[in-house]
Amino acid sequence: MPHSDTEVPASAEASTDLPQRLPFPPVTHSHILHCSYHDWQPRYRALTPKSRLIPLTVPFISYLRADGIVLPPENATPTDDDNLDTYSDDEADEQPDPSTEWEEIHTQIKTTISELGGIITPKLNWSAPKDATWMAATNDMQCRTPNDIYLLLKSSDFISHDLELPFDDCVPDMPDSTTTPDVPYHLVLRKYVNFNPSLEFRCFVRDRVLLCICQRDQNHFDFLFPLRETLRSRIQAFFDEKLKDTFPDPSFVFDVYIPPPHQRVWLIDINPWAVRTDPLLFSWLEILNMKDPIGIQEEDGAEEQFVRLSLNGNTVTGVVGAAEGSESSDTEDESADDVDEDSPFFPEFRLVKRDDPEAYAFTTPQYSAHKLPKEVVDASISGPGGMSEFLGKWQDILAKQAQESDTDSDGGQ
């Protein structure tokens, strides 16, 4: 099991009385829109890595939705190193240029790439095309040209879900509403930063309480264990100061990055409080049944005397409330004691232990369910030349199929 700083109780999933559905509150259309990058990023711009948002037009969205991968012609003249000898000038001239329908978007993307240093990583409103990196020459999310971006976006199932099913399993905000809201789609271009995946963390917030935290990368990292209390303190303070009272919804999931020297917390993403969000080292049933950490609970009874534990750096501080005319009963005291005994002091911070079976998955391919045959993968891992050669052959095959189809149609007339 993944490592946590407290003993993990027997999973509720082992019960014979399992619920047929996870006990999520209804996920509304507005909650999904609030978790869209274009909605929350302007509010937290100073907390996020440098990025630019490009509003997308209907023709460009139609291009992303269309079957097949047809890329605009490159402006640069191919060289011998490009291994594009499978293309002839005539064949290149015959290929349609899809960007003629959205020239302004195409130009804006080229300009933005240059402004952000020449290398960016793309995403749409909610998802990044991480499942399509096998199509990229570099096998990652780095993009240097608009065509690099288009290839990733059009090859990604995650992007298709953003476009086709953004409100899957959602309910209207108003019970009598029968329509779904329009989505203002945006292309997000983020300046490329070589993130250390071991320092990315997913944080779960329920009713404006930071409930639990875990690694995003599911490998074991020895150095994280001595840092756990420092990282938890940083994340708690970041949440309390920046997100707790400013995000529109009380429950959500956010991702952060805390690079050395572990002083600054970067907000990477905000995700819905919904089953579609990966709970990673937890299960959703476990999260939904967790009790709030008592160290960050707020006391509403100002007139009653209480003792509260609060998180302050790496220490536990006792806060005593004044009592004026307190007449709480023994039953109430016993109930409060029971809550304190059963509840954790701080948000659980779960890390992967050395002896976890999944602790050494460095070579395990991610998103394998979204990938294509071995020949395509082999081409993608052989460098820029291999993928370019494969794309050239692919275009040849498509052209021959189209020619044969035209011939068959003529013969049948």
From Swiss-Prot:
A molecular function (GO) term: ATP binding
Keywords, comma-separated and alphabetical: ATP-binding, Chaperone, Cytoplasm, Magnesium, Metal-binding, Nucleotide-binding
InterPro entries in the cross-refs: CDC123
One GO term describing the cellular component: cytoplasm
Residues that, per the record, bind ATP: 123, 126, 128, 130, 190-191, 200, 202, 216, 255, 269, 271
Primary localization: cytoplasm
Residues engaged in binding Mg(2+): 269, 271
Keyword Chaperone: yes
UniProt feature, compositional bias: Acidic residues: 79-101, 327-343
Subcellular location(s) per record: Cytoplasm
Pfam family, one: D123
Single GO BP term: eukaryotic translation initiation factor 2 complex assembly
Residues covered by region (Disordered): 1-23, 71-101, 322-343
Family membership: Belongs to the CDC123 family.
Function: ATP-dependent protein-folding chaperone for the eIF2 complex. Binds to the gamma subunit of the eIF2 complex which allows the subunit to assemble with the alpha and beta subunits.
The protein's name: Translation initiation factor eIF2 assembly protein
Naturally occurring in which organism (per UniProt): Aspergillus oryzae (strain ATCC 42149 / RIB 40)
Lineage: Eukaryota, Fungi, Dikarya, Ascomycota, Pezizomycotina
